[in-house]
């Protein structure tokens, strides 16, 4: 299994040190589908496409991210990697409801979940800006969205990303332990609901 972000980082031979968002429209959809088909055919394996964290959006978008990801997966057969921290970061940065995003996300296509911590800054208008920095503990709001996801999906392999300002091992293990506890609790609740 391998994954890639729904993003771009180069143009005309110039490479950028970030993952940049795409306009969510038919033209971009066709381009992304061609690339995913090529990759999956060449490697003879299924790609998991990850939702990005975004800091800007395009006026040329005529569908939202969930619609766009669902359309890509439907036409390519790729799976999805749900980065719950990215959902929260983007929801704060763009003012959308993260819980509603999770409720619409096609969890039946998710092969892996990512959790991480974010950094907080200010945008040009002194508004709150979150950065997917992978350098802090998972925030309470992200844990809540993780619970919400698992309540719909059941257990899904989960990775905690922490590659900046890495703390001592015990703190990382505590984050992993909390993810396991939540995964088991939500699986138990889900099984009880099904049995009732």
Show the residue positions of the predicted features.
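Conserved active-site loop/cleft motifs that coordinate metal ions or position small ligands
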Residues: 157-163
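Active-site beta-loop-alpha junctions enriched in small/polar residues
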Residues: 5-7, 52-54, 85-89, 115-120, ...
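Generic structural signal for well-ordered alpha-helices
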Residues: 32-40, 66-73, 102, 143-150, ...
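Conserved, mostly hydrophobic/aromatic
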Residues: 2, 47, 83, 113, ...
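Active-site acidic/histidine proton-transfer and metal-coordination neighborhood
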Residues: 1-80
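C-terminal helical cap(s) of enzyme catalytic domains, especially alpha/beta-barrels
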Residues: 169-192
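Distinct, well-ordered alpha-helical segments
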Residues: 58-74, 90-103, 170-172
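Gly/Pro-rich active-site loop or hairpin
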Residues: 20-23, 29, 95-153
